[in-house]
Amino acid sequence: AALARPHTVVPRVPHYCSGCPHNTSTRVPEGSRALAGIGCHYMALWLNPDQTRTFSQMGGEGVPWIGQAPFTETKHVFANLGDGTYSHSGLLAIRQAVVAKVPITYKILVNDAVAMTGGQPVEGALTVPEIALQVRAEGIGRIVVVTDDPARHSASALPAGVPVRHRRDLDAVQRELREYPGVSVLIYDQTCAAEKRRRRKRGLMPDPARRVVINDRVCEGCGDCSAKSNCMSVVPVETEFGRKRAIDQSSCNKDFSCLEGFCPSFVTIEGGGLRKGKAAAPVSTEADSLPEPVIHPAERPYGILVAGVGGTGVVTIGALLGTAATLEGKGVSVLDMAGLAQKGGPVWSHIRVAARQDLLHASRIASGEADLLLGCDIVVAAADETLSKLHAGATRAVVNSDFAVTSDFVRSFAAQARTGDVATIRDPQFPLSAIEEQIAEAVGPGRAEFIAGTRLATALLGDSIAANLFMVGYACQKGLLPISPASILRAIEMNGAAVEMNQAAFLWGRRAALDLPAVERVATPPEALPDHRRLSADLDETIARRVAELTAYQDARYARRYADLLRRVREAETASAPGQAGLTEAVARGYYKLLATKDEYEVARLHTETGFLENLARSFEGDYRLVFHLAPPLWARPDPATGEPRKRAFGPWVLQAFKVLARLRRLRGTVLDPFRFSEDRKLDRRLLREYERLVEELVAALRPGNHALAVELAALPDQIRGYGPIRRRHAEHARRRETSLLEEFRRREDHPDDGGARVPEAPVLMRG
């Protein structure tokens, strides 16, 4: 019955780990095609579907091309091959390609692990120089090593004529190799991100005292950082001025490829460390002060379905609850349904507890037989596989309502940045309310509870990994577990991993079940939320805040220019479309965005005068320095492959330059402005003039029948995002969209009875 109704589907598709070398290594230049390998390379089929097609069995990588090559106009392909497969049988495929003399580039990823199956060591453990020597002996004439750290490789250890290039040059290297007439090899050297994380935790690999942060006031929300990194740790954050980006410090594996995004919002923190959570409570005293919950008797088998994201500890929750039940002498079975969970896919843990072991006859929870849904991820909690286990009126649900970014978000943002097309590649949305209603309907009225587990656990304990045990604590205190709190605490202790934090997370979950508002006050005091993260309550506040911002941006006269146009728009809308305010809101946001363009003066001001440095001080502690990653317009050299200006790192001294530049903003647009003749500033002025003319035309011809079109036209500035070449791409797409919509608007003006009130595609009114 739970599956008989249509569902709001937000897929949790497996994705490469944050910082995974595959995020970069599997890409190919525009116009080229790649063949997938096995293991993690296979995932490129859905993560890079326009570039990667077909796959083969282990050891057959690239071999189908030998048969295809004589019968196609395609001159060259790339074949992805892992170091594990290379050692096993991949060398035979390369040997066959050499004999066949086909134009192909083998990209051998040396990531030092059999990544997809858990990070086992590669048999043979061939080094980069050994692989280079081996393929040279097979007759490969063109070999290039690409790596995230060229200093690791000495030219003397490699065969003669094998260059070592930085991974930022990957596109240029591949363009060179695809012109090579025979078989070439690109050895991509970068350790598996998941394995790096494990080794750092165990002290087997240095953990660099360096973290990336994004100033979301400077961020334009263009997605170029996602295009450059393909990383799941670059997450969306909603602000009064639109959807921006942030770095999830808990999941970041310190790959730093996001720094290549063409944006001045990126800052690295070198030295110091993240501040600990606000309230890592002493376990013994807290446990003693909490009232004991009712323990479910489990007279019959009690089914707990844990639904979450791979790599976040879902399987650990199953193991802990299974251990705790065993400590109490109860019967228990735990079945983990993992699949591609290690790569950020969905994972389920089926936990069944009974008074005696002989009462348990199956490990898997059957359809409609879950007593408790512990939804550690709301997307997986709403999946068909999960809903099929629920029974209205019998199942209880405790669900983490915080959204964890999906692969679709990352890929959509990246595609927008690469193309500049926001009209066709729409901003991905997360229908939280619809998903919550779906889960609530599946379990019945009053039987589902939704808690911001990730936000609370991160604020309280400094790490989002604590969220799952926070949810366990909440369910336990609500009397939804057939296991005592003491046994769960003991199981956490026996597990031996991050004992203090995990026990504290469990106890904070229990406290939240007793008094959620009190826990909210501890986790998020009013001063912890930056003002720009607070969304306006109504249109008047939206306008007033932007008037204040424009006064700080330039001066009061500049702000009056904004307010005067808004007043005329509002009066016209009230007269022509009574009861409507969509046009006024669209202009309030769109006009502000074009007036407050983030030029050199504004970037300097946003870094120094808007609380960014103070927010950093609240998040980091110790002796740290700030490094800003910028491409100054007068100094940045273009990248020979992409044409984009290359970014450089600037130390903390640049803050003084920012402060001076911010104070000089009164020069903006005057004859003394050194930036006024740049291509970007000319574009800014043209866009502003054209938008003001557009709004005047919309206001003059506004009536109920064309109101929806007017709103869509006025909202177009939201589609202009980013800096430099990224912004220019977006502006060109927005211009073409404006031309199309304006033709229809004018046609409606000439033929007022033609078509009636148009219902357009939902306009992209992200806050800006």
Where are these regions (language model features)?
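Iron-sulfur cluster-binding cysteine motifs and their immediate structural context
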Residues: 190-191, 196-202, 220-277
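Active-site loops and adjacent core secondary-structure elements that bind or stabilize anionic groups
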Residues: 487-495, 499-768
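Active-site diphosphate/adenylate-binding microenvironment
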Residues: 2-62, 71-72
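A short, small-residue-rich loop immediately preceding and capping a beta-strand
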Residues: 75-88, 104-108, 303-311, 365, ...
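Active-site cofactor/cluster-binding pocket
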Residues: 126-129, 134, 142, 268-306, ...
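Glycine/aspartate-rich loop-and-adjacent alpha/beta segment that forms the canonical ThDP
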Residues: 159-166, 172-228, 483, 487
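Phosphate/pyrophosphate-binding active-site segments
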Residues: 1-27, 145-165, 399-402, 446-448
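Thiamine diphosphate
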Residues: 45-184
